[in-house]
Amino acid sequence: GSNIEVMLGLPNSDVK
């Protein structure tokens, strides 16, 4: 859910 997850290309848990 952090920017690290976005860097890894994972769905952002903060948005989902």
Swiss-Prot record:
Q: Tell me the leader sequence span.
A: none
- Name the family the entry cites: Belongs to the glycosyl hydrolase 17 family.
Q: What is this protein identified as?
A: Glucan endo-1,3-beta-glucosidase, basic vacuolar isoform
Q: From what superkingdom does this record's organism come?
A: Eukaryota
The GO cellular component terms are: vacuole
Chief subcellular location equals other
Query: What's in the keyword line of the UniProt record?
Result: Glycosidase, Hydrolase, Plant defense, Vacuole
Provide the function of this protein.
Implicated in the defense of plants against pathogens.
What is this enzyme's class at the first EC digit?
hydrolase
